[in-house]
Amino acid sequence: MSKGPAVGIDLGTTYSCVGVFQHGKVEIIANDQGNRTTPSYVAFTDTERLIGDAAKNQVAMNPTNTVFDAKRLIGRRFDDAVVQSDMKHWPFMVVNDAGRPKVQVEYKGETKSFYPEEVSSMVLTKMKEIAEAYLGKTVTNAVVTVPAYFNDSQRQATKDAGTIAGLNVLRIINEPTAAAIAYGLDKKVGAERNVLIFDLGGGTFDVSILTIEDGIFEVKSTAGDTHLGGEDFDNRMVNHFIAEFKRKHKKDISENKRAVRRLRTACERAKRTLSSSTQASIEIDSLYEGIDFYTSITRARFEELNADLFRGTLDPVEKALRDAKLDKSQIHDIVLVGGSTRIPKIQKLLQDFFNGKELNKSINPDEAVAYGAAVQAAILSGDKSENVQDLLLLDVTPLSLGIETAGGVMTVLIKRNTTIPTKQTQTFTTYSDNQPGVLIQVYEGERAMTKDNNLLGKFELTGIPPAPRGVPQIEVTFDIDANGILNVSAVDKSTGKENKITITNDKGRLSKEDIERMVQEAEKYKAEDEKQRDKVSSKNSLESYAFNMKATVEDEKLQGKINDEDKQKILDKCNEIINWLDKNQTAEKEEFEHQQKELEKVCNPIITKLYQSAGGMPGGMPGGFPGGGAPPSGGASSGPTIEEVD
């Protein structure tokens, strides 16, 4: 295949989306199911690996081996409080591998474990394939988005996931920045505008404030709640109906995973309906112990169930405004991102908060981030079209960065929300007389003491000549590149001795070897998936051949045209094959092909004889001639294949 354009991928917690900039506009690409967003789900079964819709659709039957929310694990340590609390809610197992979390599943009868990067890489591979199927070209270059609050290690791990998926990640950019780009292209403005991005997705909520002036974006502040989103609204509805079921039928379905799962799916559908209608009905046959559950819910009741959650979305809005030192009257534009912003009540709360200001909903909220990422991909890969020429992108550091100084104090060199790339230098000195070296410990976080912040890495600068305290001058430089990767260096001014560290954050980092290995494994899994597809198609081909053959000889139009002995011979062989199929669903492709040859050996001579004696086929035979499904392995076209008879 020829080389395709660069794409933009929104790798979401619950859903992902891919877009491409071509013919002067962005196209959001639908998957093979016709959906423009794809669930970030990967499932493992005894026979295959499923990604996307196929994985999400079978979650009820296979909950422990269906992995989602990899984004909540990526770039984190196993003992991270977030990982520990999230684990309680996941049906799949998370295990500790030398301090790093891995998800453990049963796949093809074996226990397998995968790093979050590997799971995310499977979703990215799926997004890559969706784009390739649409473009008819290979896709390698991509811009991938992450939440604004992602730290260095999470960004780096996301980049690694791209590498494992065989992508060249041009840049990792913040989701609100991407949404702003999508929006910035739509409405070019001269004077400086303050834009608030309200992103309420499936599992997370982020508020960001940006200023846009002459095509230049600057992120002023970010706030949010990593655990608020559409799924929480679904849960409220699920609990409401579990209680209703208890009242009506005196039975508690909450312990029955499958019943709850079916109820949740129905609730998600009802929630979407309630964004456009004021009432939604739910009908689930045989939900629990044979009881059908037919009920309905009004929009008002849905809003009441979620009243505190909906109202709570305004707190991060206020915090973001405070951080950006802006009053709400100074916000020029409000941009909605994320499927949950379609909920009318949320739109109303937000609009009322901003004193009736119109909200920008022109870009489909599920697609805005991928849309902007696609534009950014076009810019970075050198698209020269008018539309993208005058766009500049400034991202920010999500958390303050600094070093520990005497007494465990956090001394900040780069404040949070600083536009990157950036470089800051500060001079430090020794704390005691004749101190031979200093330990530079790099932290990220907003607390005054380093013990409450997050240690990114440390290194020593030794060989400082003996001197009284306060005399040596040690210059510490923090340098962040456009991808948010941090370099910290320290130089002793008197000797010129230098030491430095690149924080690509080992607390969640994979080594080069790990990544290489995972790239290979990803290839292997892909090959296995291919093999599985071939196997299924040869099985289906054999099955349809056998059933068609049976139908053909049993057709009354053939009465008297085929002798009973021949007919019985074919029926016996067909039934034998059908029985064999029932017992050997998981046989190898070659076995199915062999069985098909055996069947053809019996059928073809009889059918040929029939054909000749009839002077052409009798008209209107059911299903035409057998050999439906994929052509048998003889490389023949469909229809009967003729072979030498032994």
Curated annotation (Swiss-Prot):
UniProt induction comment: Constitutively synthesized.
Nucleotide-binding domain (NBD) as annotated region, ranges: 2-386
Free-text note regarding domains: The N-terminal nucleotide binding domain (NBD) (also known as the ATPase domain) is responsible for binding and hydrolyzing ATP. The C-terminal substrate-binding domain (SBD) (also known as peptide-binding domain) binds to the client/substrate proteins. The two domains are allosterically coupled so that, when ATP is bound to the NBD, the SBD binds relatively weakly to clients. When ADP is bound in the NBD, a conformational change enhances the affinity of the SBD for client proteins.
Enzyme Commission number(s): 3.6.4.10
Substrate-binding domain (SBD), as annotated region: 394-509
The keyword Hydrolase appears for this protein: yes
Membrane topology summary: Peripheral membrane protein
Modified residues (N6,N6,N6-trimethyllysine): K561
Sites bearing Omega-N-methylarginine, chain numbering: R469
Keyword terms of this UniProt record: Acetylation, ATP-binding, Autophagy, Cell membrane, Chaperone, Cytoplasm, Host-virus interaction, Hydrolase, Isopeptide bond, Lysosome, Membrane, Methylation, mRNA processing, mRNA splicing, Nucleotide-binding, Nucleus, Phosphoprotein, Repressor, Spliceosome, Stress response, Transcription, Transcription regulation, Ubl conjugation
Complex and partners: Component of the chaperone-assisted selective autophagy (CASA) complex consisting of BAG3, HSPA8/HSC70, HSPB8 and STUB1/CHIP. Identified in a IGF2BP1-dependent mRNP granule complex containing untranslated mRNAs. Interacts with PACRG. Interacts with HSPH1/HSP105. Interacts with IRAK1BP1 and BAG1. Interacts with DNAJC7. Interacts with DNAJB12 (via J domain). Interacts with DNAJB14 (via J domain). Interacts (via C-terminus) with the E3 ligase CHIP forming a 210 kDa complex of one CHIP and two HSPA8 molecules.
Keyword Phosphoprotein set for record: yes
The protein, known as: Heat shock cognate 71 kDa protein
Free-text function comment from the UniProt entry: Molecular chaperone implicated in a wide variety of cellular processes, including protection of the proteome from stress, folding and transport of newly synthesized polypeptides, chaperone-mediated autophagy, activation of proteolysis of misfolded proteins, formation and dissociation of protein complexes, and antigen presentation. Plays a pivotal role in the protein quality control system, ensuring the correct folding of proteins, the re-folding of misfolded proteins and controlling the targeting of proteins for subsequent degradation.
